[in-house]
Amino acid sequence: MSVSRLAASGLLLVSLLALALDGKPVEKWSPWLWPPRPRPPIPPLQQQKWLDPPIPQQQKWLDPPIPQQQKWLDPPIPQQQKWLNPPIPQQQKWLDPPIPQQQKWLNPPIPQQQKWLNPPIPQQQKWLNPPIPQQQKWLNPPIPQQQKWLDPPIPQQQKWLDPPIPQQQKWLDPPIPQQQKWLNPPIPQQQKWLDPPIPQQQKWLDPPIPQQQKWLNPPIPQQQKWQRPLQPEVPSLMELHQERQKQGRMMHHDEDPGDAAEGPRRQKKEPGKPEGNGCFGKKIDRINAGFGCPKLPPSGGH
């Protein structure tokens, strides 16, 4: 009986082992074999995976690779884009690029030995303004040498706008033209530093201030120097309010002052007993709080 059971369990183990292997060869290397056998070789890693991936073939036309000897310079211009900007020669890359032939009429080229400086100023014009080209002399005429430190001369066709001011009147007001003399009459010379006179139709508004008191305050009439000020000295509104508060704190509000015959008398109700109002049960008041009867007590609700 026991032998048959052992045989059955052995057959079961063999069948399970056959199912687990399922035609696979047994591995030759095992970590628990002794002596240890050499492990299988590890496949090499892809080198340069930490760099940029290679550029695909269909995108190599975007930016050409920079040669090793020119990586510190500007990248070379592709062949199909050389019509935009001509290439800069190697010996002039630190200078300004040469000006094309068709643009030399804009700005003349700077000499090679002076490209890093400013163009030289002629010796005889270093303290003056640069000369005006021939084709621009009609814009602004040149200023004569003897008048450069003065005001520029007035052109002939503009002399009718503002007449010149005479030398002896430059510190005064300019003269009034003849056609505008009817607008404002001229002010005499000895009154220009004073106040203008008050017209006749406005003399009833404010009397003129005397000349010797214009820089002072107006004089105080003699009959008011000894009088009291016009506004009487009354306590302020805040002082009156504080006085009423103090009087209210000192009074007994629970007592009736009464009259002269009967004297003060106290209130009828007891201070600790509330007054009944005839309400019973749970009723809702005016604000739906459920605190009692909606009608007010006889005292007014306070």
Swiss-Prot record:
The keyword Signal applies. Disulfide bonds join 279-293. Its main location: secreted. It is found in: Secreted. The modification Pyrrolidone carboxylic acid is found at residues 48, 59, 70, 81, 92, 103, 114, 125, 136, 147, 158, 169, 180, 191, 202, 213, 224. Keywords: Cleavage on pair of basic residues, Disulfide bond, Hypotensive agent, Metalloenzyme inhibitor, Metalloprotease inhibitor, Protease inhibitor, Pyrrolidone carboxylic acid, Repeat, Secreted, Signal, Toxin, Vasoactive, Vasodilator. One of its GO terms (molecular function) is peptidase inhibitor activity. GO terms for cellular component: extracellular region. Residues 32-302 are annotated as: Disordered. Residues 24-47, 51-58, 62-69, 73-80, 84-91, 95-102, 106-113, 117-124, 128-135, 139-146, 150-157, 161-168, 172-179, 183-190, 194-201, 205-212, 216-223, 227-273, 294-302 form a propeptide. Expressed by the venom gland. Residues 240-255, 262-273 have a biased composition (Basic and acidic residues). One of its GO terms (biological process) is vasodilation. pEKW peptides may serve as metalloproteinase inhibitors during glandular storage. Their inhibition may be instantly disengaged, by dilution or physiochemical change, when venom is injected into tissue of the victim. This is Snake venom metalloprotease inhibitor 02A10. It comes from Cerastes cerastes (Horned desert viper).
